[in-house]
């Protein structure tokens, strides 16, 4: 094992030693399903390796009575997993990419971004409102979401609705919707509902024209120790080139804006005919003030290649030496350019006011 010298262990099976890779994950059912998906891909690629899943709770899992945007910490769903990586208790961890900050702590990197599923949001309705849409819900209906991004966009579009914070994992939120008479509907990520096998609960899909999605939404990320070359090589084959380039652009946009979950920032990316289109927007908390722009860059979706030099620096926390560097840099530059355009037009004022108001709410 190269890198920091620790990582994988071995196990006896049929008298022969098998290498064991320890995979860290959050404890929620959705997190376990996502991790099982990644492990299944790795097992198919490396049948001679055994994978052991180690589940743990994160700060975001434990603090359930406060909106995420109010907790005031960036690595809400990743810090404990990174601590386990640092202590060599696990060899890699699986995250929802949207939970991973655009700047990682020293010593860590995203070694793989898997093929993105539907990045859009969905509305799940209380049984008595099945067949409705957000537009046709009764006046002052309560819609549950813990996302400032969703509230800012949807409040502007559907002023007759009231948006209320709802926390907990998907199971908890659906139970609150169905059993309490508090919510007429809740807004969740399509990808999460699909992974849980709950597609039948999707009452309305919010397309980007109605509600742009979070940076990285719908994609899974594999985080590893940056110097653990062996594990980096092992997981890098999971990189999906199109997803990678879209997410580099999105993360570069967010990082350059200095955004996070405490301000409403949203994106939409499309790769078509050798062009990467990035739409990004910022909103005031109530959605009354907003700014959106679209830019594009010429980027062909590359096939994976032989690994480039080992000393290539990360881009927005991601290492992908098997994807052409030029394409990655073009995607990063697109995100930076779009953020710069918005900042030059006054987006910083919108974001600063949103942060201040969020702090005092």
From Swiss-Prot:
Top-rank EC class of the record's enzyme: transferase
Keywords: Acetylation, Cytoplasm, Heme biosynthesis, Phosphoprotein, Porphyrin biosynthesis, Transferase
One Gene Ontology cellular component annotation held by this UniProt entry: cytosol
GO molecular function annotations of the record: hydroxymethylbilane synthase activity
Keyword Coiled coil set for record: no
Keyword Thylakoid annotated: no
SUPFAM superfamilies the UniProt entry points to: Periplasmic binding protein-like II, Porphobilinogen deaminase (hydroxymethylbilane synthase), C-terminal domain
GO biological process, one term: protoporphyrinogen IX biosynthetic process
InterPro entries: HemC, Porphobilin_deaminase_cofac_BS, Porphobilin_deaminase_N, Porphobilinogen_deaminase_C, Porphobilinogen_deaminase_C_sf
Phosphoserine: residues bearing it: 69, 147
Residues modified to N6-acetyllysine: 74
Family annotation (Gene3D superfamilies): Periplasmic binding protein-like II, Porphobilinogen deaminase, C-terminal domain
Disruption phenotype: Mice display the typical biochemical characteristics of human acute intermittent porphyria, characterized by acute, life-threatening attacks of 'porphyric neuropathy' that include abdominal pain, motor and sensory neurological deficits.
Disulfide bonds: none
Primary residence: cytoplasm
Residues the record lists as S-(dipyrrolylmethanemethyl)cysteine modifications: 261
HAMAP family: Porphobil_deam
NCBIfam families membership: hemC (TIGR00212)
Family statement drawn from the similarity comment of this UniProt entry: Belongs to the HMBS family.
Assembly and interaction partners: Monomer.
Name under which the protein is recorded: Porphobilinogen deaminase
Organism listed in the record: Mus musculus
């Amino acid at each position: 094992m190269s890198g920091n010298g620790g990582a994988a262990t071995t196990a006896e099976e049929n008298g022969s030693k098998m290498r064991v890779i320890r995979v860290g994950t959050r404890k929620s059912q959705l997190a376990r399903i996502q991790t099982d998906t990644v492990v299944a891909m790795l097992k198919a690629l490396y049948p001679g390796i055994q994978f052991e899943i180690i589940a743990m709770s994160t700060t975001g899992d434990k603090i359930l009575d406060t909106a995420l945007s109010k907790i005031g910490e960036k690595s809400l769903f990743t810090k404990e997993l990174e601590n386990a990586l640092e202590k060599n208790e696990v060899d890699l961890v699986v995250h929802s990419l949207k939970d991973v900050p655009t700047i990682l702590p020293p010593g860590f990197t995203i070694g793989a971004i898997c093929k993105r599923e539907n990045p859009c949001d969905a509305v799940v309705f209380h049984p008595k409102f099945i067949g409705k849409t957000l537009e046709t819900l009764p006046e002052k209906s309560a819609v549950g979401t813990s996302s400032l991004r969703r509230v800012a966009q949807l409040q502007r579009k559907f002023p007759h609705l009231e948006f209320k914070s709802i926390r907990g994992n998907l199971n908890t939120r659906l139970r609150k919707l169905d059993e309490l008479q508090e919510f007429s509907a809740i807004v969740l990520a399509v990808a999460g509902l699909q992974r849980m096998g709950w597609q039948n609960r999707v009452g309305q899909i919010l397309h980007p024209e109605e509600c742009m999605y979070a940076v990285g939404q719908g994609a899974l990320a594999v985080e590893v120790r940056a110097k653990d070359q062996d594990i980096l090589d092992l997981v890098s084959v999971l990189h999906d080139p199109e997803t990678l380039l879209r997410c580099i652009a999105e993360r570069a946009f967010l990082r350059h804006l200095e955004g996070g979950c405490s301000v409403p920032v949203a994106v939409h990316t499309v790769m078509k005919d050798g062009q990467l289109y990035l739409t990004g927007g910022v909103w005031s908390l109530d959605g009354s003030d907003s700014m959106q722009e679209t830019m594009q860059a010429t980027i062909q979706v590359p096939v994976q290649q032989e690994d480039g030099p080992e000393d290539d620096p990360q881009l927005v926390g991601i290492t992908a030496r098997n994807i052409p560097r030029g394409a990655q840099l073009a995607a990063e530059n697109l995100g930076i350019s779009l953020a710069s355009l918005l900042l030059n037009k006054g987006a910083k004022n919108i974001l600063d006011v949103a942060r201040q108001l969020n702090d005092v709410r």
